[in-house]
Amino acid sequence: MNLNFFKKSVIASFTFTIAGSYFVQAQEVGNERDIEEIVLVGVADIAKHRKTPVAVSTIKETTIIEKLGNQEFPEILNNTPSVYATKAGGGFGDSRINIRGFNQRNIAVMVNGIPINDMLNGDVYWSNWTGISDVTSSMQVQRGLGASKLAIVSVGGTMNILTRSADKKKGGVVTLGLGNDGYHKSLFAYNTGKNLKGWSASFLMARTAGALYADGTDFEGYNYYFALGYQPNKIHDLQFTFTGAPQWHHQRGAAPTINEYINYGS
């Protein structure tokens, strides 16, 4: 079965970070006293370690780079409590995750707070997000029920994948990975760094191809990422992110029986 997902999966997100204080002073009327008030406004949906009262784990970018290797992205969560992830043997990008026994249809998976579960059955097609591991800055996994502003069925838990912003440090990297069954991955990334006017940009391109251990599981995938940042001062930061991961892969949906193996081979 040949699954072609060259329909580009694209996330474009704007992030505004604003911190400010507002000074309100009531005008004096008659004998009333002046009232001074400070109003602080902020929104944060990221759990803080040892402060937010939920069972949550945070996987940093350094951990992903060190331990992922040629595994599929969900498999990095196997060291997380109450999480089970597997390739499932079907093909490239056909992984699945269980949290506390609940399958993906009962887990809310989000990228920068945007749900990516299928709108019909709630499933997650990781083959559409094969390049997300290259652009992830951190990932939080909340186990069990939690408060959410979105109408999502997340009785098993919630995953929020945060992508990189434009890197403030200038530099680049080129990587090449090789594995069994013709697996190879090449990646190029470059960061301009933040200039004197507050502008910064990051760019990444990657290609992954090869096959799994089973016959007929060839695949090829690409990943592109661009981020543009503007920080005019210390309290304002504007980030624009654009990423996508077109790919195709052959899928092994069912294993042959012993009788079929004897008659037709593998």
Where do the model's predicted regions map?
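Cleavable N-terminal targeting peptides that direct proteins into the secretory/outer-membrane pathway or into
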Residues: 1-30
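Short, glycine-/polar-rich solvent-exposed loops and beta-turns at beta-strand/coil boundaries
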Residues: 31-33, 52, 82-93, 151-155, ...
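Transmembrane beta-strand segments of Gram-negative outer membrane beta-barrel proteins
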Residues: 36-37, 136-141, 157, 163-178, ...
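N-terminal periplasmic "start-of-domain" segments of outer-membrane beta-barrel proteins
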Residues: 36-67, 96
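Extracytoplasmic beta-strand/coil segments of soluble accessory domains associated
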Residues: 74-115, 137
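Outer-membrane beta-barrel architecture
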Residues: 75, 98, 140, 160, ...
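Short acidic/polar hinge/loop motifs at secondary-structure boundaries
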Residues: 115-143, 162-163
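Transmembrane beta-barrel wall of Gram-negative outer-membrane proteins
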Residues: 171, 178-209, 214-252
